[in-house]
UniProtKB/Swiss-Prot annotation:
Gene3D superfamilies: CbiD-like
InterPro entries: CbiD (IPR002748), CbiD_sf (IPR036074)
Reaction equations catalysed: Co-precorrin-5B + S-adenosyl-L-methionine = Co-precorrin-6A + S-adenosyl-L-homocysteine
Keywords: Cobalamin biosynthesis, Methyltransferase, S-adenosyl-L-methionine, Transferase
The name this protein goes by in its record: Cobalt-precorrin-5B C(1)-methyltransferase
Length: 379
């Protein structure tokens, strides 16, 4: 995505909606400028970063301060016209140089702490997700060079109060906000315009001659397809939470094979007949897992443990410990059955496949051998 595409508004019902940037971009920019100020020993009031999506952001710096080998800077979060709980708050970084050669990243005041398994971060760590961790560390390394070390602390004085308006506590992230953002950019869209934009991508793929499509919830699915399946991501289309809508659109456009690829946290819902996977529509992840574990003869102890989990990742640890990993093949087959039930009045329904993978990019299960599916997709 270019600077021009970032500046270009998103149009909805004739209204131009402004894009914004994530807490991850704010933290990255704040850390970069703080590191630069320590090195140069003068205040800087504007900083540029390149987001993971390739957008260059030029951001204003607030509250810059230098004291010896330490500097502090803040970036104000701007969600564009997609206003959320963190919009308008300051995200600070404190950078202290040292001779260790290592960069250490921590979360301070207002940054949540991970207290439960299942969010992809170690227990007790700061709620700074993987992509922002990488961009923060890379930006600081670029600023200080290969030999120096630095302690980087991200903090947000308003974080604890703002977090009350988020789902963090339900996920076991306590005491503040999360530093998040896979692309670094916030794109505001209503649901209908968002769905239409996704459908347009399907239309473009079909117009190029593709007969097989891979539908993924988000960026992680595309990475899995590329790295673990060895399939050209030209066939990948993001479906977000709109599973049913995108399947129907794929059928309308004449695709002959639909492959659903994603983490169980999203795809499990399809096994229960839930075709809009946003949590405000329906959840039932644990109930679905418990029901299908019971069908496979799982002991009551495992069913109880899974039923009490707050996240799919946490439930997966219990499932693995009890030796019920074969449930993922079972669920993948059930997902395909649900899709075919939805399409039961379609004259010539497409082939449907489903593949489930873990956060660390390993195959968990599929309705048939993944190699077989991948070979067909490469034709």
């Amino acid at each position: 995505m270019s600077e021009l595409s970032f500046d270009a508004p998103v149009w909805h019902h004739g209204k131009a909606l402004r894009k914004g940037y994530t807490t991850g971009s704010c933290a990255t920019a704040a850390a970069k400028v703080a590191a630069l100020m320590v090195l140069r020993q003068h205040l800087i009031h504007q900083v540029s970063i390149v987001t993971p999506s390739g957008v260059t952001l030029c951001l204003n710096v607030e509250s810059p301060h230098i004291e010896g080998q330490q500097a502090i800077a803040a970036i104000r979060k701007d969600g564009g016209d997609d206003v959320d709980a963190t919009h308008g708050m300051l995200i600070f970084a404190r950078v202290t140089l040292n001779d260790s050669g290592e960069i250490t990243l921590t979360g301070g005041e207002g940054i949540g702490t991970v207290t439960r398994k299942g969010v992809g971060l170690p227990l007790g760590s700061a709620a700074i997700n993987r992509t922002p961790r990488h961009t923060i560390e890379s930006a600081v390394r670029e600023a200080i060079g290969p030999a120096r070390g630095a302690d980087v602390e991200i903090f947000a004085p308003e974080g604890e109060a703002r977090a009350q308006k988020t789902y963090n506590s339900r996920l076991g992230i306590l005491g503040g906000i999360s530093i998040i953002g896979t692309t670094g950019i916030v794109t505001p869209m209503s649901e209908e315009s968002w769905k239409r934009s996704l459908s347009l991508e399907l239309e473009i793929k079909r117009a190029s001659g593709l007969m097989r499509v891979i539908l993924v919830p988000g960026n992680h699915g595309e990475r899995f397809v590329r790295e673990q399946m060895g399939v050209d991501t030209q066939a990948v289309v993001t479906m977000s939470n709109f599973v049913g809508y995108m399947i129907e659109e794929a059928v309308r456009l004449g695709f002959r094979q639909i492959v659903l690829v994603g983490h169980p946290g999203k795809l499990i819902k399809i096994a229960a007949g839930i075709f809009h996977t946003h949590s405000h529509i329906a959840d039932a992840r644990m109930e679905t897992l418990v029901a299908h574990l019971a069908l496979l003869g799982a002991p009551l102890e495992l069913l109880t443990l899974v039923g009490d989990c707050d996240t799919t990742e946490a439930a997966m640890e219990h499932i693995e410990a009890y030796g019920f990993g074969h449930i993922y093949n079972h669920l993948a087959k059930r997902i395909c059955w649900r899709v075919m039930q939805m399409l039961r009045f379609t004259k010539t329904p497409p082939v449907c496949d489903a593949i489930l993978f873990s956060f660390d990019n390993h195959i968990l299960g599929s309705n048939r051998p993944v190699d077989e599916i991948a070979k067909e997709l490469q034709c």
